[in-house]
Amino acid sequence: MKREDVRNIAIIAHVDHGKTTLVDEMLKQSGIFRDNQEVAERVMDSNDIEKERGITILSKNTGVMYNGIKINIIDTPGHADFGGEVERVLKMVNGVVLVVDAFEGPMPQTKFVLKKALELDLSVIVCVNKVDRPEARPDEVVDETLELLMELDAGDKQLDCPFVFASAKEGFATLDLDGEKKDMKPLFETIIEHIEAPEGDPEKPLQVLISTIDYNEYVGRIGIGKVDNGEIAVNKECIVVNAHDPERKEKVRITKLYEFEGLDKVEVKNAQVGSIVAISGISDLSIGDTICDVDGAEAIPFQKISEPTISMQFMVNDSPLAGQEGKYVTSRHIRDRLFRELNTDVSLRVEESENQDSYKVSGRGELHLSVLIENMRREGYEFAVSKAEVLYHYDENGKKLEPMEIAVIDVPEEFTGAVIEKLSQRKGELQNMTAANGGYARLEFSIPSRGLIGYRGEFMTDTKGNGILNTLFDGYGPYKGDIQYRKQGSLIAYEAGETITYGLFNAQERGTLFVGPGEKVYGGMVIGQTGKTEDIEINVCRSKKLTNTRASGSDDALKLSPPKILSLEQALEFIDTDELLEITPENIRIRKKILDPTMRKRAKFS
């Protein structure tokens, strides 16, 4: 049976192509907000980090009514680091709206999310967004998107997909660029016409595959999934079949049931085939679990999630300043928080190590792990992390394989030489180079994942902030040999204390400082970057010796350059293999793993 009064769609796109803004506009024009209601920009991005970075990390569910048809919309992350989210939520929908920037065209992560949709044989609608941009080239972008579909072996149904031209910012969609540009009606009607209605059998035993987990401090864990067969109702007795151990079956009762309307979850008594529902009251529900009838407990196969490619060690902070700024500082606190993250993030892996105070955390990329670190920091955790390392595989002959990436770089023509030189040093191979479009050339590289660790900051410096770097995981390939990372050494504090202008003034002649006057430092803490290859120890807490013949005002004449304040991402990129990042709610500090200078030298030459 088909539910003709329901359509389930996911909005997929490369990061920053405007899909969250498009969903905002669909919500506004469907009439879910009151006329006098103030609506924030990118209302679907609810997490603080999402708003600050302008990216979507967690998939979001919403529902709108259009001409008596309920359209359930899922806004998905555009960054491949959060691809585990995309892969799961696509199981809930029958079609996707692929949003493509009218200037940039299809990008690496467009390819990533589209490939996942095609593997599931979903219907596709292409929305060419930002057609109001002066440099927009919609006709060429249509051709590029069709080429991408052919490259990904799309079927006839998907190659025959409709194209809608839109400006989410201006609030219009049209099927013809020369036609009327009034509202989003053409997009709504295309969705209803081209996306198939969800199908299922209401007479069969209940099946709901949990695709996402939400958490609410009042009701606890909330499982979100689509009703594939049967009917779900409040107070119904069900069986939860565990995703990883199908023999493990737990009897539960549905206490609360919700559907999505606009930005809200609305309580309902029951839900039919094809509905996307949120279920609360089941304490240890996990992603991939199936909720079934007591009589016919049959699990739905769970989508295999791509494996992690990089790892970091998360450990207890043991620096001299440990425990002064964090609320949660013990090994048990860190362990509980990391294992709790596994409940909602299927792409993450956490392993206990031989050292009780350290945990190996593996994820899909530096951004994936940096978002976890930032969330923990904001929640009051204090801990330390190591430099990111890639996860190697070995083939049947014992040959070492490493994760590879496709890097697509848009850069002003004058910087192409510097980019090619740097990426070649990092074992990158130039696959394709497209002539400048609007002054920008496009370079495509195949490069080991470890070749990109720590490169983004260097890239922004080399391109004076004008370059755009996008990457996509491209499987495993033969190990490419050693890569030399940072060429500059570290400036290391020699003793504990507070930094003083006089000490910093002498230190800044040796390199770039990361600290200003009046900051707490300790021996072994990295306080800057040298201009040379070796590390330099320096006393930044040293004050000027007092004499009877001091020139008036000579101390005031000491001019300090402003310190370079590193963001979390920059600090993660900067640290070397013998360094750690100390994370607290108030500060991010870089330090040597071995703080004692004598022991550090001994370890280096042993």
What are these regions (language model features)?
Residues 319-342, 557, 561:
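A short, contiguous, amphipathic alpha-helix enriched in charged residues
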Residues 123, 133-193:
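Canonical P-loop GTPase G-domain recognition
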Residues 231, 282-284, 363-369, 412-416, ...:
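Helix N-cap motif at beta-to-alpha junctions
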Residues 260, 265-268, 401, 447, ...:
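Long insertion/accessory domains within large nucleic-acid-processing enzymes
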Residues 39-42, 152-164, 198-209, 238, ...:
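Interdomain boundary/hinge elements
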